[in-house]
Amino acid sequence: MPIYDALSALPNGEPSPWGDPIKISYGQRDVLLYAVGIGSTDLRFTYEGHPDYSVFPTFPIRWGGMGAPIDEQHIPRSPLPLMIDAERYLSVEKPLPLEGTVTLQSRIVGVHPRGKGYGFVECETLVTDLDGEVCVRMANGSFRRGVQVLGDIEPFTGSGQTFSSKIEVPGKMPDVTLETRISVNQAQIYRLSGDYNALHVDPAAANFGGFEEPILHGLCTLGHVANMLLGAFCGGESKL
């Protein structure tokens, strides 16, 4: 069975070195397509001619962990159907440009066991603009559900820090209840923003990953929730 050696990957529990900078360029079409992919109908995010047109805050979420220097000798790669987004954190320090080029740098901060035969790899990512100013800080956890087959990672000792924390459900009624309708072809739309994991569209890939049918991207669900919360509590206003 595949073995994770987290102690060798992250000696003394320290984060890995930052990966090489990655340049990412995006345009108006990318911004609009992402907004539609998370169910937004707000013209501030879906119409470039709106006077307050802007990039939806979670637009860069899918870049989390890109370029992180993962030592595959110690942390073997999992096929995409056995990898799913587990947890995300995003802090917008400065609105992203409406279009242009940004720089990403990522590093590994933790590798820990999760359940029987699974692993959890966490990364930290910074997104900076052309002036070198940080626009977005992100942390993401990737749930590795196997390397060769579902749940085949040997038990191992974790290393590094974790951003993961248990969320206690308040013992009171919710302040607000929100509902939305997700289209049956939402995964096909959302994947056009760059997440082409077959788990979300191909029944065979979904079965390999242990699911009866394709599942919606977790980041698409996150985007829908962010869209609802932004509308309910901020009037759709995303600017700092």
Question: What feature does the model see in each segment?
Answer:
Residues 1-19, 83-178:
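HotDog/MaoC-like acyl-thioester-processing domains
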